[in-house]
Amino acid sequence: MSPTILSFSGVTVPAMPSSGSLSGNTYLRLIDTQCSTMRELKQIHASLIKTGLISDTVTASRVLAFCCASPSDMNYAYLVFTRINHKNPFVWNTIIRGFSRSSFPEMAISIFIDMLCSSPSVKPQRLTYPSVFKAYGRLGQARDGRQLHGMVIKEGLEDDSFIRNTMLHMYVTCGCLIEAWRIFLGMIGFDVVAWNSMIMGFAKCGLIDQAQNLFDEMPQRNGVSWNSMISGFVRNGRFKDALDMFREMQEKDVKPDGFTMVSLLNACAYLGASEQGRWIHEYIVRNRFELNSIVVTALIDMYCKCGCIEEGLNVFECAPKKQLSCWNSMILGLANNGFEERAMDLFSELERSGLEPDSVSFIGVLTACAHSGEVHRADEFFRLMKEKYMIEPSIKHYTLMVNVLGGAGLLEEAEALIKNMPVEEDTVIWSSLLSACRKIGNVEMAKRAAKCLKKLDPDETCGYVLLSNAYASYGLFEEAVEQRLLMKERQMEKEVGCSSIEVDFEVHEFISCGGTHPKSAEIYSLLDILNWDVSTIKSGFAELFDATTRIGFTYLAEK
């Protein structure tokens, strides 16, 4: 008798015949050729359970492999895994690899330990170790990763390129460059994956010059090599170098990808280079890059940080699918550019859209309240975050509330909020209160805030500078000078200021007290003339430029 044929949502599943046994090969072909969604897979899985064919390890492992292909389906994958009675190495490797790429990498390690304890006949294989190293790297557990490294050496697999590269990447991800460098130096022959990992490691740890040296020495580069350097420059604040490297990348005829575009947009955002940002946007459209949420968010962020709000809104409105990151970037962009009411309205629109605001969403709307000085609405949003969305406020949220209260002159309430908040205080929140004290004119509270700031970080110049400025604004010049002298005695230097300007599609960066630009003499000469003109202008305009401003104004030079 031929088996009955059942059809579920486009997947045709043969049912158990009235007599005899049906081979699992038909189901395996269905999974390979017709199954494309978890809903369809679950229908096939149910039929396999009903027919008893799921007891076959090969069949069950194919179901498991389908589930493990997507990190979001690992809960179901684990359910399938626990029902497999005879787990072969393929089954163990599949579930470990799936969890190593999911939101629960610790499960990969836990299952690996179970594998070691399961049976003497089941041992880790060449394909097992890379997934476990990946999990250790994502968790930042280099210490446990070293123990696995020792196991690899004991098994004689340290020269396997696949294992070695994932091991090196684990050390790089955890910031253990010495161990990574030892593995790198022990390599025989050129391996572009290992070179790229070391470049990323140096850049991540702030050793961008070493990263560039290694990049320059590469016998052969691929797109990842260029992306690693460009993103490394952005990570280390060398935004102009990132744009310059992209030009070199184009000269070498290397095709960029979406990751390249996002890094370049971030560089333009920090530099305020709107012209170059627009060109990159046009490049993305012209070359038909996928406008996924990461690219769209980077575009919105770039336009907003360059002050081009309408262009940012246009990108937001035209986005094919608005993920939460797009909403958050637009809300924060509006808040930081003087469109506080529109930012709050957009937050309300976000709530109506069906998406649920997260902690970043509330940073955006509280920023709008801080800039507009709306204490009541800030308090409403703060309560909404905790009571409706069950989001515990972070130090950033409390700092914004201090800004709101301080800006409204409610210094006592702001100080009380800091002292009673359940999170650990930091220098930023006390700096915010100190700045508010300076504006309002509360000397005693300014002293208390500065004391707390210095206690948290004795080597931080911010407390001395802010308190000195506060004293000066109150007319207490002796006390202001005293703070500056204390900084000098303790050999504390304020971080060098930096600014940039875009002229004719070229970015010019300037740093305080520098003189490296070829036209430094001309720049200083012109600034001296401007300084003199400002000082001789009559009436109140000259009062806007105190002596400190005029002196500091002169000592800027292009990097």
Curated annotation (Swiss-Prot):
Residues 505-535 are annotated as: Type E(+) motif. It comes from the Eukaryota. Residues 1-14 form a transit peptide. The keyword Plastid applies. One of its GO terms (biological process) is RNA modification. Keywords: Chloroplast, Plastid, Repeat, Transit peptide. It is found in: Plastid, Chloroplast. PPR repeats lie at residues 88-122, 125-159, 160-190, 191-221, 222-256, 257-291, 292-322, 323-357, 358-388, 394-424. This is Pentatricopeptide repeat-containing protein At2g42920, chloroplastic.
